[in-house]
Curated annotation (Swiss-Prot):
GO molecular function, one term: GTP binding
Protein name from the UniProt record: 2-phospho-L-lactate guanylyltransferase
Pathway the protein contributes to: Cofactor biosynthesis; coenzyme F420 biosynthesis
InterPro entries linked: CofC, Nucleotide-diphossugar_trans
Gene Ontology annotations of biological process type: F420-0 metabolic process
Subunit field text: Homodimer.
Membership in a protein family: Belongs to the CofC family.
Reactions mediated catalytically: (2S)-2-phospholactate + GTP + H(+) = (2S)-lactyl-2-diphospho-5'-guanosine + diphosphate
Length: 220
């Protein structure tokens, strides 16, 4: 079985630009990808990267200039076996999480992201299904499964729902991460527990002067 991982090769994780430099965002995105592909392979899946530009990586690469939904739906329409679609920014996901999804009796297993999104889908009959990401895609995918006559299971998991999009999301990676992305983040970012909600802040004792995009203060 294959796991398709959409991966943005240019200007990755731009919403983290307030706290991370372009080089840091690029490296973090690559390490999150490494963590996720490692988990997928350990769970017995063959990794396929879906990108908009050629990219050197130890995996099958599918390059498409189409939008995300069109590119994924092209892949699903030609698939002859079950397919997992997993986003490249959920580095907390574990082998057990993936195996639990694969073991579900449902036709489609959907793991929601925060804010109504969809982080992972496991589709047993891909030619009967299509995806519709962006917006409240979790609700859209549940509807699509029903309209297609497919049973759907919601996979409720903190690990799978923790996507790293905003600065505040880095807190979860810093606290709970066990992979290379978390190790990298901890080399220059620390937790700010001084007041209210926990935040991340740049650790000036670990970062050479001039490397960071702003002052060493907690993220907003």
């Amino acid at each position: 079985m294959k796991a398709v991982v959409p991966f943005k090769t240019v200007n990755a994780k731009s919403r983290l630009s307030a706290v991370l430099t372009a080089d840091e965002r690029t490296k973090l995105a690559r390490l999150m990808l490494d963590d996720i592909t490692g988990v997928l392979r350990e769970a017995g899946l063959k990794v396929v990267l879906l990108t908009t530009a050629p990219f050197k990586y130890d995996a099958e690469i599918v390059v498409s200039e189409k939008d995300l939904n069109s590119a994924l739906n092209d892949f699903l329409s030609s698939a002859s076996e079950p397919v997992m679609i997993i986003m490249a920014d959920i580095p907390l996901i574990t082998v057990k999480n993936v195996r639990d999804m694969l073991a579900s009796p449902a036709d489609v297993v959907i793991s929601p992201g925060r804010g109504g999104g969809t982080n992972v889908q496991f589709i047993k009959e891909p030619q009967k299904y299509h995806v519709d990401y962006y917006g409240a895609s979790f609700l859209d995918h549940m509807r699509i499964a029903g309209d297609s006559g497919l049973t759907a299971e919601v996979f409720d998991s903190f690990n799978a729902s923790s996507d790293i999009d905003e600065a505040q999301d880095l807190v979860e990676l810093h606290i709970h991460g066990k992979g290379r992305a978390a190790e990298y983040l901890r080399t220059f970012m620390a937790l700010d527990v001084s007041k209210g909600r926990v935040k991340v802040m740049r650790d000036v004792q670990k970062v050479p002067e001039g490397r960071h995009p702003g002052r060493s203060v907690a993220t907003q």
